[in-house]
């Protein structure tokens, strides 16, 4: 099997702009990507590809393949799937709460397709055993689209139920979840930016931080 | 073991008022309560208590105990826990995505305390093996409070990771999750109010509904 991470660094995550500048967001998305790569490493996924429109913001120590593609998430992933000859795990780069344990479970199901929904009808992770036959359709309630595509192919499907894996970081209030439940580098960054010590060895959202209005 | 459901019907869920009238919200919260009771029934939890400030909006076919308490969620639950002499599952009434399978798993962990976090630092479900010793503290990031209380008691803790059980229905966009992932009576109600058929045997959010602005 291989994992593929679609990734955009430049001016990414514009919905976080009320609390993070462009430069900060670019730093933050790279840390989230590092957390996702670490989860894959922890699950002993050795073949990792990044699909990106520019080589900016790829971690220096990343050992996998980086493919520069034209803009267009669906087209670039579908081309990738067409050329794949082994099971493919498509995992988004904004999932810093995902762990190696989640990945191990997701790739161990026997169903043809495993879907991890994102908030609001998104698709955070897709594991596809026979990728040549599959077409992705991200955006516009992709969770429903991917269920329908799987049905139409007469493939079996497992919907993976995890709060942590379903929490993609798009908006300020998602960073609250990251601070509460995270463990990696993106969480550390958020704590430094928005946290204050509670005195009990935990970090809470500082009432002085820009995030306090979003809790 | 026993399950206890804190419940408020009258003028409940005010954050849903942009899309549901007071009367509609009262109908909707009763359906969510029915779904929670069904999940407990499915898990063969036979002793179910409802703590409520008024007998309004209790399902007619509910066979358990209804206790009318003074307002004040923490005080009424803590009094309940003080008098308990068996493990207690505290489950909120606004969890229509929770299933019998979740409940069965939650009550089967060996840890002293099992916590199902809610969005934004809430606590959706708490399973407490030794309830006399425990004090709940809902509101103001109760997830952290309950972790700290468990730590201070030197008890073991399991944090249960489920997107469905962590999705409490507070705001319009939560109803999107209910329509996408629900199976019970509250989901049916939401579909009738806000859905339209896709022609593929699925229901999508109608662009004509009040919910369309929240997707």
From Swiss-Prot, chains A, B:
Name of the top EC class for this enzyme: transferase
Pfam family for this entry, one: CofC
GO molecular function term, any single one: GTP binding
Keyword Nucleotide-binding: yes
TM spans (from-to): none
Family indicated by similarity: Belongs to the CofC family.
Function: Guanylyltransferase that catalyzes the activation of (2S)-2-phospholactate (2-PL) as (2S)-lactyl-2-diphospho-5'-guanosine, via the condensation of 2-PL with GTP. It is involved in the biosynthesis of coenzyme F420, a hydride carrier cofactor.
Record's protein name: 2-phospho-L-lactate guanylyltransferase
Taxonomy of the source species: Archaea, Methanobacteriati, Methanobacteriota, Stenosarchaea group, Methanomicrobia
This protein's encoding gene: cofC
